[in-house]
Amino acid sequence: MAGHGAGGRRASTSRAAARRVEAETNENDDLAAAAARDLAAAEVPAEVPHFELDEDPAFWKDRNVQVLIRIRPINAAESTANGQRRCLVQDSSKTLSWTGHPDTMFTFDHVACETISQEKLFGVVGLPMVENCMSGYNGCLFAYGQTGSGKTYTMMGELSKLDNELSKDSGLTPRIFEYLFARIKEEEERRREDKLKYICKCSFLEIYNEQITDLLEPSSTNLQIREDIKKGVYVENLMECYVSSVKDVMMLLLQGVANRKMAATNMNSESSRSHSVFTCVIESRWERDSMTHLRFGRLNLVDLAGSERQKSSGAEGERLKEAANINRSLSTLGLVIMTLVDVANGKNRHVPYRDSRLTFLLQDSLGGNSKTTIVANVSPSICSSSETLSTLKFAQRAKLIQNNAKVNEDASGDVMSLQRQIEDLKDQLTCLKKQQNMPGSPSFKLLKSGYGNEFNSLHGVDDQSACDLELLKQKVIHLEDVLVGSLRREKSAETEIRKLECEIKSLNRLVNLMESDTRHLRTTVKLRDEKIRRLELLADNQISSDGYLMDENAAMFQEIQLLQEQINDNSQLTQFALENKRLIEQVRMLEKFSKQGEREMLLTEISLLRNHFLHILEQKYARPPKNMEAQGDVTIKELETCRKELDACLENNVLLAREVNKLRCELKQYQKCGTGQVAPEVVESSVIPGINQKQHDQAGWCGSYLASIDVERQFVDVGITTDITESLELTPPSEIYSENQDSPSRLHFSDPEICDLKNSTKVLEYNSSRNLLDKGIILSGQLENECGLNSVQNDEISLVKENAEKMYGHDEISVYRQNEILHSSEQLLQDELTHIKSLNEGLKEKLIIMAEESTKLSEIIVAKDVEIATLSEEWESAIVDLTSFLTDGCSSLDDAYQNIDNMISSFPYNNHSVSEHVEKAMKVSIEKEKIISRLQIELQAAQRMGREVKEKLHILRGATLAITEAQLLDNDESQEALKLLDLMRQKDCTVQELNDNVKQKSCLFAEATEGYSRHECHLPDNVGTVAEISHNRDGSEVNQANTHYQAKLEDVLHLVEDKSNKVLALFSNFEEAQETMEEAETMLSSLLKANEELKLEKDSCRQAVELLFAERTSLINDLQELEASNSFTAQRYDKLHEQVNGCVAEMTNLATIIKESFHQVQRVTTVELFAFCSEVISFGQDLRKWIYESRSYLVNMGALLEEQGNSYAEQNRRTNSSTYAGVSQQVESCSRQLGGMNGDIFPGTYMVVDGKEKASVHVVPFGSNAELEDTNVERTFDMDYASLRREFDRKSDVAEGLSFDLKLLQESTSQAKDMKDKADEISDALVSVQRELEKKTSAMESILKQQKVLEEELAENGAALLILRSELEHSESLSSELFKENNNLKVMLEEEAMMISETKAMLEDKSKVIEGLEHEILLLNSSEEGRLMSQIKELNDNLKIISIDKGNLEEEILKLTDKLEMAVALAEENEAASIEARQAAEISKVYAEEKEEEVRILERSVEELESTITVLEEEVCNLKEEVRSYQIYKKSEAEQAQEMFIVDSTSKCDATEQLCPGRCQLEKRLKAEIIAHQDARRKIECLTMEASCKDEEVRQYKEHIAELVLHSEAQSLLFQEKYQEMEHMISKQKFGLHESNSDTGHTKFEKPSGRTRGSGSPFRCISSIVQQMNSEKDQEISVARQRIEELEGLVCNKQKEICMLTSRLAAVDSMTHDIIRELLGVKLDMTNYANMLDQEELQKLLMASQQQIEQSKAKDVELDMLKEQFDHLIQERDSLFDDMDQRKADLLESQLLIEQLEQREQMLEAQNGILQMEKDNLQQRIMEMDEEIQLLVGSNQAIAETTFQMGSNHRSANSEFSRRLAQSDMLLSHARHEHSRLQAAKSSRTRRGSHQ
């Protein structure tokens, strides 16, 4: 990647240099050429390929989720921004590729390209959805994608309709509903017979900011989602509208779309800001077979709001809040889909449906009962590549969801409504029958009129053709066939019904038997439980044996009494039996009566009527027909009426059959309530004969014929009773079936005869058959009346049955229970043991049978598996052959078609025979194609069958496996023994194999030694031949054969050389053998040493094992003691706890009681005291008031008495002195006047005073007047005194009462004091009780503390126990490991012994070989050839040298082994280093990411610079436009000046008149030019100011970039230093500190995550980055210090742990000594198993060695992997450093570019200065022109010359100005190109960084 990036950068820099050169060379080109180049640089849009969508009608059969990707075209904004650059490429109609890094391919169900129309999309997506919803499935279709990807266009599109047709841009929703209502109309018309009706309900809602709003009723907001068991998830108070056409749906859609939240963003002009859900519920209802079927489907059409980013959409304020809510709900949707995918993969996950309103509402659509289609909309433009990728990943995850769609159908009809309907139909039937039978009914009249017309027509017929007769005959035959078929169907239905009834009866009997068995079992179980309970009590000695026997006798006596009572209560059984006998006799009598000839008479009459009917028909058809047309119409009408009546009869039959079935079901239900239904059936049988007798009496007027029919029906009714009675008497089912068969067969036999009679009455209208017809009508009416009477009687019978069943149900149940109790009590004791034994034996037999069956099944399954495998192979081969044959046939057919076409085209003229042959061939080929297609279908069917068979076999395998597992569980011990035997055999086999291998190797070695000896044997023969030749050389033949000898000698020399070479080879082999021997010796020595060491280790291990066993025993004893103590302490603790709880409960109860009593006493006393005190206080106050009042009253009375006494004294004095005279005079006058009336006065005075004081009254007449007055005064005084005395007495009485009350008050106060004293005593007692409570609570607390201490001790003991157990386990594991090592060592020793013996044998062989070689060497020494000896010496020297080298090599091998160990240690350290290096790499990755963020911030700053540059460019363009306008203005002025000169030259005489206005115009123009120049100057000054500002900003940017570069370099240096320090620490660190290093690594990894991102502006970001870098340095220093401290702490902890381990090891050693002691005792018992253990140990050692070898190999592999990972990490680090260097280079390049831009800006400033200078020059020239204009007034020629010069100067100035402007434009375009190149390089760099 780095290489590619460097190459790309070099290429880009070279291209930039080339562009610069071209720009410098083409500086003088004009603006048009630059514009043309820009247009040529733009990309030309490539043609998008078109892929058609594949429609798969069988897709939804086995799948429930469909995912479709829709790609929208690139819009204008995207094309202007990025051209036609794409991030997606469609490969096919189901695949597309993402062109980013890395290139990824996605596969979906459908991929819709940019050119797919809305109609085609609806055909693939919407149409199947409608079909599924009409079939009763729930459906959901929702569009997903980013904002502006075309979701709303896909779902809604254009909702307007043109000419009642949808436009081509209409979305899926209107098209779906258009097709839906068309299908509804079609289905309703097609299924009109089923009364199919569809109902559609629609609702429209939106989810805006996680609040649900009804779009059809916008006032209802914030609706709530509810969940119901029946409804599922629904929205509360949501408006649902019924729709019946597309127009209604369009109105709702328009209304909802108008109310939906829409807003404009940067990505879309009309962006939907909410999720909308349009729901349609489609309900269909139809009737079939008197059942109402209901089916409904829910269709959800969801338009999701798009996911968006704030940067791209520019959302602010409310739009930003909306975007946040939308993204939240969409992220929840993605999370739900991810969890659903995990659930589909078999993981247990919680699906967070309720985290969002959208997912909660679409719960069924996502992983529920629905067929769901997801349309993912994507944009192919490169600017939205990340959103497109996320959408594709979302769709790929959604494809893995698994829904479970079901048909929502309810086929349960309303039973009550059906029953009512049956009753209504019954009533209608009876009414119709009555109306038809009545003579005044219209049907009767119609019959008569019809018969009269037919009679007239028969008499007045004309001669017609015989064809009409044949037609009528055919119609009649057809009707007769229809009647026969209907009767046949009825008979078949009746037979099926009877069969089902028999089956139901048998099943009921079985059910009753099962229930009786269960009841018997329950009673037996209860009795057994009671007996067991008694026996347990007897066994526990809770009841004595005598008591047990007494209890059992009493219980048995009670049971016997109860049974006797039940038998006595059931005295009615005998009565029922007698009634049964009587009813059976009646039935027999009725049967005899019916058999005596009534049925035969009826049959004879029917046969006579049938013959008569046939005779009439023959006469009718024999006569010549007249007026056949009218007769044909009448017959047709009659046939239609017959057909209608037939249909009605059939319907009635069906209804009656259903009623019969229902009645039978009810009877069965009643029968299930109790098996012995004797009483009700007897009552029924007793009631029915009376009813039948009534029926017979009522029907007596009908004659013998009707009486016979009545008798027959009575027989039928009585047949029912006989059935019931026979069922009670337990008759066989065949007889019941025959009895049931008789009654309906007779009825059905009479029904067709009656129909024949009716038909005969309708057809026959002759005079001769009039009487028969009338008779038939009367009979039919009577029969129908009888039917009605029978129905009434049947109703009465059913009522009587119900009453009887209700009355006798209780008696039946009681009788049944009594029978059960009797039966159970009689057979209980007898069958108890036998039943249990039989059950056990049966279970054993079943187990054995099941085992045998399972084995047989397993064998059969294995055989079947083999057969299936062979069949599947044959089938696959056959399929391959068939497919190849079919493909070959297709190819041959194609070739034949081509050949035929070629032949036809080759013929010059049309030949009919050829065309016929061609057509035949075509037909044959078509037929073959059909055959091929049929074969393919059959192939597919066969494949399906094969799959089904495989599945069934798989199920059978599972069952057999389950059975075998059950058997295996039963036979575990035997299997383990077999396994051990197998292991032993395997071990024996392995030992034999090893012995065989050793023997083979020894044989090979022997063969090699024999070959070596043969070669050595050949050597002396050769030497002997050479010696013989030398001896013969001294002979006489030497001279003769000199030449020949020389040749031979040369040959021999060659042979000798060859042999010497062979000898050298042998010596080399010998040296190798010596080396191997030496190595074997060294190995032997090392093995002997190792063996001795192993023996020592074995002894030590044995000792350790003995110690461990001893420790184990001690630990076990300690554990047992601890457990015992623990149990004792636990018991003690429980007792204490119980005591404490009891004490606490008692104390709490006492406290509560005392508190309650104290509170009650306190309340009572306080209430009484308060009441008494208040009474006392009120009474005292009243006393005080009364005393005070009495005192004041007495004082007043005394004062009044004194005043009255004084007044009386004064009055006496006055009366005595002054008034005495007047009184006397009055008295005298009175006496005079009254002188004559003394007699009247005295009695009057006496009468007046008599009631008061008689004495005074008597004194009055005898005293004088003065005395009378005195007496009056005295009397008044006496009276006053008496009244005062009375008051005084009364007051004294009151005072005494008050004193008594005071005494009572004193007593009450004393009582109150006593009560207070008592309350104080009670309070003291309470205080004492509280103190006692506190003491007891303190005691309780102490007890609880002790309890806690005990619990802590228990916990510590438990922990100690756990520790001891863990140590025990550890010691056991150590002992087992040591045991295994001992076994391994034994095996190694044995192997070494074998190797030693083998090496000894080899050494002996080699010693023999050496002796032979020495002998040969001696022989060679004795020979003449010294060269060989010298060579041998040299060889010996070489051997010595080689042996020395070998020793050196061995030393080097030892060194290498040491190095290898060091390398292993280093590798382990390198592992730790690699771990830390990974952590460091992760930290560097994080650091690189932070740097990338900084680079992004710099890129943002560069973007801001780019924006400023664009602003400057715009201003420069504006200047250019102003300059151009100024040039145009100058040109126009020059043209006007030329025109003026021409005018002046032509009219010299009028020059003086025209000078004044021309001058004025020139002055005005000059002023305008001056103003324009001033404006231009101002603008230039503004531009210079802005340029200076931009220079300052660029300078600041440079400074900041330089600081950033310095900081980054410093950071990289610090990072390198830290990395080196880390490596140094890793090299120094020990192996035990890896975990701490990993922890610190984690802390380091977590450290940079706390870094905060910078702010928006680049300057703040740079300053924050500097601060962050400083803070990071401080943090890293602190982290390093912490790490040092942690390492020191870890060292201390490790030392402590080492101390602990040493102490534990010492304890373990002591324990092992004890264990070894115990093992010594155990060894005596293990002598018998020594051989077996040795073999097992051998095998274990072999296995352990193999495991060690495998572990070493695995460790080597892991080391290699770690090394590779380490190398990979190093490469990643290098790549990171390279990236850093590249970024530095990029920064430097950016700095250079910025400097170049600054230079260009300086150039532009210089050009601006030059332009200003030129402008000043122009102004000066304008001034000069003004002066020249003034001079023009003098002379015309001077004016012409000056104007001409001015024009030329202006043109030259304008040309120079335009040239400079062109140069500035070129520079600007060059800068723009450079800027775009930099942008592209940065974008590519960021992509590479993100991919890396």
UniProtKB/Swiss-Prot annotation:
GO biological process: microtubule-based movement; mitotic cytokinesis
Recorded GO CC terms: cell division site; microtubule
UniProt feature, compositional bias: Basic and acidic residues: 1633-1649
Positions of the UniProt region annotated as Disordered: 1-28, 1633-1656, 1870-1892
Membrane-crossing residue ranges in chain numbering: none
GO molecular function terms noted in the UniProt entry: ATP binding; microtubule binding; microtubule motor activity
Record-listed ATP binding positions: G145, Q146, T147, G148, S149, G150, K151, T152
Organism: Oryza sativa subsp. japonica (Rice)
Stretches assigned to the Kinesin motor domain: 64-401
Record carries keyword Cell membrane: no
Keyword entries, A-Z: ATP-binding, Coiled coil, Microtubule, Motor protein, Nucleotide-binding
Protein's UniProt keywords contain Calcium: no
Coiled coil: 406-438, 486-526, 1066-1139, 1303-1357, 1396-1528, 1780-1841
PANTHER family xrefs: KINESIN-LIKE PROTEIN KIN-12D, KINESIN-LIKE PROTEIN KIN-12E
Xref: Gene3D superfamilies: Kinesin motor domain
Protein name: Kinesin-like protein KIN-12E
Pfam families membership: Kinesin
Origin superkingdom: Eukaryota
Family designation: Belongs to the TRAFAC class myosin-kinesin ATPase superfamily. Kinesin family. KIN-12 subfamily.
Gene this protein is translated from: KIN12E
